[in-house]
Amino acid sequence: MKGKKIIALLLTAVMLLSMAACGQKTATDTTTAAAADGTTSGETAGEGLVEAFGKKAGDIGVVLILNTNLGDHAICDLSDAGLQEAAAMYGFRAKTVELGGDVTLQVPTMQEYAEDPDWDIIVCGTSNLKEAVQQVAEEHPDQKFILYDAQDEKGLPNVFSMDHCQNEGAYLAGVAAALLTTSEAPLANAEKTVGFVGGGENTALDDYLIGYIQGVHSVDEDINILVSWIGDFKDTAKGKELAVAQAGQGADVIFSVAGIAGLGTLAGCAESNIYSIGVDSDQYTVLLETDPTTAANICTSMYKKADVTVSTLIAKALDGTLEWGSYAKWGLQDGVVGLATDNDNYQSIFSEEQKSYLEGVQADATAGKLEILSAIGMDNDQLQQILATATK
């Protein structure tokens, strides 16, 4: 319950900070040197001492290592925003390192920071970094690691890992897509076909997809779901190409889950004059000023509040309440996934009846009344059987 209270508090405090993406072949970083007299929560508030680490807040270093790059208006930017919010709250030194999707940089970059005593906590996202975290954490048992969007099945005593229940949010996105494609909405056609464009295949992306499929088919089992993979999270041209191709095959709504590459998918939907569904942040609102043409076709987004997750986990680590060696899953009940509904596009595109239906589905899902399947921990044969139901 304490963890959920912290989440609830930070939901109102975290602000989205977007930064431009840097190079792809060498790890790049952005460092924030917070005030050394920053305070902590609990009994030591105002004294600047973090008892869990035996240091003043300003002497603590927290580094965020991202598998890809900032500038995605999605999970990377949100994660960095969460780090910066926590740094402002506690006063520790913060650094964000971008790996640019280069797998050869994962282990050496983590080793560099694990061997440097100036860095007390290494936060890693997302699932593609799991094996590297496990390797380096075993090599450096005194270094603390926070891994999000992946589970450390080894239960290493210096690692806290967690998954977002993106399947739950994606289920709602699927329901939204199905409601539009079967309606008389201006951009809907008669094909009863929707799409999904993912970045690179991994467990987290499969979790999005399985939830999306189930959500679509909960409305109409005969809806055809086109599935395409970009192969990485940075190729915006490929993302756009796949969106245009799916539109040509009859899709009138596409769910984009592909990081920076997903911005290309959203642009492809706008070019093809079909609806798109964004991911992680409210991408309609985020893109409205910089790319209003693309934003105009985003009917909603499945948010995943990685900013809240990162800031909450760091806060718990500094407060001494994070259970190292354990694993958690946060979803609808924790307020970290859901649909972006508080914007003009959602309110104008969906009818009152559709909005009421979506509210009811979200309420039932949050209350645990719906059995939403998850790819996390699922047998691969079962997973493939479910994924095969997408195409009719």
Tell me the role of every PLM-derived stretch.
Residues 24-29, 33-392:
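A residue-level marker of the well-folded mature domains of exported/periplasmic proteins
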Residues 1-13:
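Positively charged n-region of N-terminal signal peptides that target proteins for export
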Residues 18-21:
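C-terminal motif of bacterial Sec signal peptides marking the signal peptidase cleavage site
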